[in-house]
Amino acid sequence: REKIGVMFGCFSYGTRVQLADGSTEKIGKIVNQKMDVEVMSYDPVTDQIVPRKVVNWFNNGPAEQFLQFTVEKSGGNGRSQFAATPNHLIRTPAGWTEAGDLIAGDRVLAAERHLLSDQQFQVILGSLMGGGNLSPNLHDRNGVRFRMGHGARQADYLEWKTALLGNIGHSVRENDQGARFVDFTPLPELGELRRAVYLGDGKKFLSEDYLKALTPLALAVWYMDDGSFTVRSKGVQQRTQGGSGRIEICVEAMAEGTRERLRDYLRDTHGLDVRLRSAGSGKSMLTFSTEATAKFQELVAPHMAPSMEHKLLPRFRGLGTVEPRFVEPAQRLVPARVLDVQVKPRTRSMNRFDIEVEGNHNYFVDGVMVHNSPETTTGGKALKFYASVRMDVRRIETLKDGSDAVGNRTRVKVVKNKVSPP
């Protein structure tokens, strides 16, 4: 068996490869003309998508069939399309997977433009804890739409937040009561965040990792969105010098377990004396002691909007230093849903093509990350056989602790079981 190689997959002539100059070219043309080009390739060491040279070209003769894939994307017509042999390796969030093992609904990794700076991501994290929300893109496109809205009296605050996200396309509308809403263009980089926060029960779920990621800017946005401040003393007497008061922040939109996690996070991470209580309206509130109020306001004061300084003690006002920070757009990997897999109708030429890419051994076809490999490896690396089992995992219900989602009940079915020679 030493002379038998392992077969790898290929693509049909018309599958478009992403070149380093931003254009695309048919893989068949690249191979037939042995084009000296650079393609975009993912570097796992730097976690960046970078240009790499094509160092080999393969026309591996006729294929029995090609699978035609349609994958969601944010731009253009909202679709990525390519045709591969069933044994070609496609990158998924779980690793490399043969094309023939993918079905509609599975997710693959695709290159999408990222626009958000770290500062902007914190604004969104804080807004989600408050009045902001994420909604899915329509028409099966990749991307998530961030939206925020405020009443007429908070118009200046809404403008301040919108300016921090000023490089993201958006539209503004106003309702009959004067409230304004800002809808941002869908961003693929927020897809995983939406999946983590919205579990289907109508309440926001914030994990330990979400809370650990929060900076004082995110906490400030949360406080400005949903917090209220009541002055207890104006600081005339020496023991209350500088004034004192109490913060309350509404947490009704959060799941019950999330409220407790948030309370514990504020206690353990920031040393704040906070407790949960139910207000007269039945809404859940997070209440700060006078000492915790001063400590929290000192933490968030440099990140407060000028129009929200009435939520600060006098000694913490005028300290805001937040300026918009934008970054250059960059291509990054995001999960993208497979919308459809079909056997491609036979064409006059059924030849299969592949390229070899310097260093990283991967490239992108219409935005989707795929493995590069020659049709065969050296025979010494051949395996005796492959065992491939595909299990279909379906969520059938959400497990809850009170009203907090803590897990899922799933049903698993073996849908493909094959043992075959290479």
Swiss-Prot record:
GO terms for cellular component: cytosol. One of its GO terms (biological process) is intein-mediated protein splicing. SUPFAM superfamilies: Hedgehog/intein (Hint) domain, Homing endonucleases, P-loop containing nucleoside triphosphate hydrolases. It comes from the Bacteria. Its main location: cytoplasm. GO terms for molecular function: ATP binding; ATP-dependent activity, acting on DNA; endonuclease activity; single-stranded DNA binding. It is found in: Cytoplasm. Pfam families: LAGLIDADG_2, RecA. Can catalyze the hydrolysis of ATP in the presence of single-stranded DNA, the ATP-dependent uptake of single-stranded DNA by duplex DNA, and the ATP-dependent hybridization of homologous single-stranded DNAs. It interacts with LexA causing its activation and leading to its autocatalytic cleavage. This is Protein RecA. It comes from Mycolicibacterium fallax. The gene is recA.
